[in-house]
Regions:
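Hydrophobic transmembrane alpha-helices and their membrane-interface caps
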Residues: 315-362, 792-840, 873, 900-903
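Juxtamembrane segments of multi-pass membrane proteins
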Residues: 473-594
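Pore- and gate-forming transmembrane helices of large, multi-pass membrane proteins
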Residues: 290, 319, 371-408, 770, ...
Length: 975
């Protein structure tokens, strides 16, 4: 190994100009491939392609251009006070204060009634503004597929009696019949009026239950909130929400249209939210934070270098070496991978903080060697032999964490791990090689500058404070261990924050609007999609989820599909019978009998009474097409939209939601079809059969089974049962019981932003702890290979393991929680934490004096760790709380590892090797063996260096040597 390094160093440094030209050519090529790098903003491609949610999401994107909407929210400036009371009511609801919520809602209602004319006028202005905007949006065919803001609800209004539950329609008949009987009595010339009371039937309690059908108010054409203070325009874009570049252009275009409309002249203002806007804002806050973070990181590193080296020349050399390493890394990435993603785009600042460490270690050791020998090539070689091997060991342990990440299912993490792995090794090599070339050229052209690399006597001599600090290692170790145990006591109390909202920018407008929509409309503005192949399957899914099963009712609000607009056929038949009865009841009523205010309802009553049962083919296209693919789509199928009760930031509830609806196993024969068949047998008599009925009496089950086993295909079709369902019934009969009929199922998967985010959470949860353990295992293997012994490997792990314990304990103490982002810091902290132990152990084995070892390597360890710390702590400048939490955890973790490495590890090394017997009996670490100690070809250059005093082997002493002496243990051993 020594011969290889020696020949390589000679080849590079004896021809520094040629080496520099080769380096510049290599940098030029790297720069060329770096410019070809692009950022792939399609986050969908980062998830496992075979994941069911990803597969279905791709299908939805192909069918309708992506799930979700870009939502434009129109509101007016409320000068009367209703809105302020509503806001307080919504907050009280979130806080669980039911009494305050009711009080504020009542106050809001009172304000509206008090200023009814004002709010009516504001409602009209909102609707006029929506008409104006919708026309402009629809004209932009590049970005907008369609806009949902207003619907022709006459189809639903005219067929309202068929949508009512049969028992509710029966109740309406009772009230109508009572009124008719009263009016008939009043028309009798012999009627005697005994009281002034008059019965006026009120149907609001019944009608209000059906006011919102398929998430729409059937009595108002516009997509407006019940309080009439917010109107939504749901824009279905032509592209996918996971394409960030498309999101940006869409957002810019929509906001330009709104701005040019000058809505503010009418007192209306617009807000923006929805799947597309939320995804864009989250990405932009992440990327927007990188520039100030990068600047702060670079400035902090430069300041620390100036503080430790106090020479701008050293800073310039190290920063050029760092720049070269980064450029080569990105050049390799451009050549082999070709693109960065939203995760790997931040890797530059991380590698910058990591890479500068190796340059600092090189420069500190080179100055020490050059001061002793004043032979340039020999000094560089000795630096590489000793510190270089330690740096290689450090680089391999650091990359262990990244290697583990490279096997992640999430491509964002895996590509991050791959780039960070070779990037760390490339930068480690360039920090040594490029810095060495720069020094060689500098001293070749400006020999007088050699004095700036020499250490003065104070820099070579351990201070009295340092000797005193390490003079009582037992006491020092005891104090540090007690402090660690104190903080470690709190470690089990650390909490995991599943609230994904705490990762976002605080008070972001799009997120706040998302909340407000949920409050005002009592719905989620981010529906998920279930894609099925056939119309029969879409009916079965709708039936399975309507009503929502009790076990998932906490996560799912409602499903919306074509079948929301088609009541169960059995219910339609039962309701038609009741309508016939009402018609019969009304025969005695003549228009002349009715008062003027009653007579105006007569035309609508006639429409209601004449309505006929219908099937899905009669549903207007403006309702039906939203559940089908667009004409140009290669994918065919049917969509059922699922409205959740949770949002992206409800981490725990989100996983419950994913577990409930991520994959569904749905019976092919729906309840509504079974109950339609049962109703057709006549067993209900004058009664009715509930469409969602699941349990049957013995007589009902016998009648249903008889029909299932005997009805012809034509009979089933006459009941509006779809052909595919009929084929399923005929294929599997005869049936022994209803459970058998319901046992034939198919599986579905749910797609959408919630599903994708839930998949990411599951990947992090599954891989996080395993990544930590595997990284720890790889680190131990690397240490054993380099140390050639088990005990020193364990000792070097002390700063790491105790540092993590202190980190977690300190987090619990200050109330900092783990989350889905900062948990990934720990595998990285492993790599950072271990390198301090490596440098200290190597130097201790070389000098055999812990005080001298810490005097020489301590400043380098502190400088390199602080530069790393600056890189990570720059994340504290980010507005996005996820990045902010990463910065906090990394800062605490790296600082804890550094403090323990500077205190506890030296004390333990001194205690463990105090007798020197164990040290001499152990195998010498790689880089310090006999073969590395002898190189006769270099001895000829020794006279050119400063006189070297022979240094006898000494134990710990208070004697301060003026010139650092190189210990030649290997020669002693070779004897």
């Amino acid at each position: 190994m020594r011969k290889f390094l020696s020949k390589s160093t000679d080849a590079v440094l004896t021809r520094p100009v040629t080496s520099s030209i080769c380096l510049l050519i290599f940098l030029f090529v790297s720069a060329f491939y770096t410019t070809r790098l692009s950022i792939n903003s399609n986050n969908l491609e980062l998830l496992p392609p075979e994941n069911p949610s990803v597969v279905i999401t791709r299908k939805v994107i192909e069918m309708v251009g992506g799930s979700g909407f870009y939502t434009v929210v129109l509101k007016f400036k409320d000068e009367k006070g209703m809105t302020s009371h509503l806001v307080k009511a919504f907050q009280a609801k979130r806080d669980g204060n039911v009494d305050l919520q009711k009080k504020e809602l009542d106050l809001a209602d009172a304000e509206k009634r008090k200023h009814l004319a004002y709010y009516k006028e504001r409602e009209k202005v909102l609707k006029r503004s929506s008409e104006k905007l919708a026309e402009l949006f629809l004209a932009d065919k590049e970005f907008v597929r369609f806009v949902s803001y207003r619907y022709n609800v006459s189809f639903l209004q005219d067929r309202l009696p068929l949508f009512l539950k049969t028992e509710d329609l029966s109740e309406i008949r009772k009230r109508v019949k009572r009124k008719i009987e009263e009016e008939v009595e009043r028309a009798n010339p012999f009627f005697i009026k005994l009281t002034d009371e008059e019965y006026n039937p009120d149907f609001n309690d019944i009608i209000s239950k059906y006011q919102r059908l398929a998430k729409r108010d059937i009595f108002d054409e516009y997509n407006i909130s019940p309080d009439k203070g917010m109107l939504l325009l749901l824009i279905k874009p032509t592209g996918s929400f996971v394409d960030i570049d498309f999101d940006k252009r869409l957002d810019q275009r929509i906001q330009t249209i709104v701005k040019e409309s000058h809505l503010e002249k009418d007192g209306v203002y617009a807000g923006y939210t929805g799947t597309y806007k939320l995804n864009q804002d989250d990405y932009e806050t992440l990327i927007g934070a990188l520039k100030p973070i990068g600047i702060a990181s670079f400035a902090g590193i430069a300041f620390l270098l100036l503080l430790f080296f106090r020479n701008p020349l050293f800073i310039a050399m190290l920063l050029f070496s760092l720049f070269s390493g980064l450029l080569i890394t990105f050049g390799i990435t451009g050549f082999f991978i070709g693109e960065l993603n939203s995760i790997t785009s931040i890797i530059g600042s991380i590698l910058m903080g990591l890479g500068i460490d190796y340059g600092i270690q090189f420069l500190y050791r080179f100055r020490e060697e050059f001061t002793k020998k004043q032979d340039l090539i020999r000094s560089i070689k000795d630096t590489i032999y000793h510190t270089g091997v330690a740096s290689l060991s450090s680089a391999l342990t650091t990359t262990s964490a990244f290697v583990v990440l490279s096997f992640s299912e999430f491509r964002g993490f895996s590509e991050f791990g791959i780039i960070a792995t070779y990037g760390t090794l490339v930068i480690a090599v360039t920090m040594y090689a490029v810095t060495a070339i720069q020094i060689t050229l500098l001293l070749k052209w400006f020999p007088r500058l050699s004095k700036v690399f020499l250490l003065n006597e104070a820099q070579q001599t351990p201070s009295r404070i340092l000797r005193k600090f390490y003079s009582r290692p037992g006491l020092l170790a005891t104090v540090v261990v007690l402090a660690v145990l104190f903080l470690g006591f709190f470690a089990p109390k650390v909490e995991f924050d599943v609230n994904g909202r705490n990762l976002l920018v605080e008070n972001q407008e799009s997120v706040n609007l998302y909340d407000e929509i949920s409050d005002r409309f009592d719905i989620s503005s981010d529906p998920q999609a279930i894609v099925v192949n056939t119309l029969e399957e879409s009916e079965a899914v709708f039936d399975y989820m309507n009503p929502v099963p009790e076990e998932i009712s906490g996560s799912v609000d409602q499903v919306v599909s074509l079948w929301n607009f088609v009541p169960p056929y059995g219910q339609q038949l039962a309701n038609r019978k009741i309508l016939d009865q009402i018609s019969k009841d009304m025969k005695p009523v003549k228009p002349a009998f009715l008062k003027p205010e009653q007579r105006k309802y007569l035309p609508k009553a006639k429409v209601f009474l004449s309505v006929k049962p219908y099937g899905y083919r009669e549903v207007p296209d403006y309702f039906a097409t939203q559940f089908k693919e667009i004409p140009t789509s290669k994918e065919k199928g049917h969509i059922v939209f699922l409205y959740p009760k949770v949002a992206l930031w409800h981490g725990g509830k989100l996983l419950e939601f994913f577990a409930a609806v991520g994959q569904l196993e749905v019976p092919k024969i729906s309840r509504r079809n079974l109950n339609t068949i049962l109703y057709s047998t006549g067993i209900a008599g004058k009664g009715f059969i509930e469409p969602s009925k699941e349990t049957y009496s013995k007589s009902e089950e016998r009648a249903l089974l008889a029909a299932l086993n005997s009805y012809t295909k034509e009979k089933f079709l006459s009941l509006k049962i779809l052909p595919g369902t009929v084929e399923t019934i005929l294929e599997h009969r005869p049936y022994k019981n209803v459970a058998q009929a319901r046992s034939y199922t198919f599986k579905t998967s749910t797609a959408g932003s919630l599903m994708l985010f839930a998949n990411l959470i599951l990947i992090v949860q599954k891989e996080g702890f395993a990544a930590f353990l595997i990284t720890l295992f790889l680190v131990i293997i690397v240490l054993i290979l380099f140390y050639r012994a088990f005990l020193p490997a364990v000792l070097s792990l002390i700063p790491l393991l105790l540092g993590i314990l202190v980190t977690v304990g300190f987090m619990a103490l200050i109330g900092l929680k783990l989350n889905f982002m900062n948990v990934l810091v720990f595998p990285v902290v492993i790599g950072y934490g271990i390198q301090n132990g490596i440098y200290i152990y190597y130097r201790f084995r070389e000098d055999h004096d812990i005080v001298r070892a810490m005097a020489m390597v301590g400043p380098a360890v502190i400088a390199s760790t602080l530069t790393t710390l600056v890189g990570w702590s720059a994340l504290l400048l980010a507005d996005q709380r996820g990045l902010h939490s990463i910065g906090k955890v990394a800062t605490i973790g790296i600082a804890a590892c550094l403090l323990i490495a500077l205190t506890l590890l030296p004390a333990i090394l001194e205690l463990a090797y105090r007798s020197r017997k164990s040290e001499e009996s152990e195998t010498v670490p790689l880089g310090l063996g006999p073969e590395e100690a002898e190189e006769p070809t270099l001895e000829a250059k020794i006279p050119e260096a400063l006189p070297i005093q022979p240094k006898p082997r000494i134990a710990k002493s208070d004697v301060k040597p003026k010139i650092p002496l190189k210990k030649k243990i290997p020669k002693k051993k070779s004897k």
